[in-house]
């Protein structure tokens, strides 16, 4: 919980990572090779974060993510109410194997799906490799968070096509498309009621404020991308700077900081 104008605001981070990396990705400096449940809980306590949605860290080499999915499911049980696990899937492995991993994740009790089209070398709207996963996700009522931005395979346009083709499937555009994609993501969200966006990675405040003003506070989720960004950065961006510029109501802050992700995950 954090205090805003005398009001207690619950905080649930909708975008975080756990696990261990085997090979270093060149763009991550300083290198983050391992971030486990204990590290997550410490970061949460330091930032006043009540809960997190978390999924496997990019492993740095081809993987089906089974091992980390299992670890996250175990952590979710150990820290019930604080850790909400998503399974990570690699569509590039083909639909047969990946659907099996998905069904295993459902049995583990994981609450959603994360896909990074760039790391997995698979366009977000791939009809043969991704759409069977979306059909299964929709069947099981699992929200899907796509990394959005930095490359054509993960473009807002491609993910928007998925959202249009699966209108009952909750889609989260991770990082809101980053700075270059924010406005396109907002336009998609205005047309597709199943599209949401998280705050992580939108470093230019005017664009982030536009996402709230144009798409509405019921479509924006607080997310940090921890451990790659400190949780406190995103909290301050929203509750201090965006609130000042937009004069957000406390009710709007509650939606962004926890209410929207609780609704998507059916957390009471």
Feature locations, PLM:
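Conserved, mostly hydrophobic/aromatic
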Residues: 15, 44, 72, 76, ...
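Alpha-helical scaffold segments that flank or form the walls of functional sites
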Residues: 30-55, 62, 69-77, 103-107
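H/E-rich (His + Asp/Glu) clusters that bind or coordinate divalent metals
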Residues: 170, 177-268
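Active-site gating/metal-coordination segments in enzymes
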Residues: 59, 63-143, 191, 195
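Mid-to-C-terminal alpha-helical segments outside catalytic/metal-binding sites
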Residues: 1-14, 18, 23-51, 217, ...
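Active-site environment of divalent metal-dependent phosphoester hydrolases
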Residues: 19-21, 59-62, 92-94, 118-121, ...
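A general structural detector for well-ordered alpha-helical segments in enzyme core domains, enriched
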Residues: 39-43, 68-75, 101-105, 129-133, ...
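Hydrophobic faces of well-ordered beta-strands that scaffold small-molecule active sites
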Residues: 11-16, 52-54, 84-88, 113-115, ...
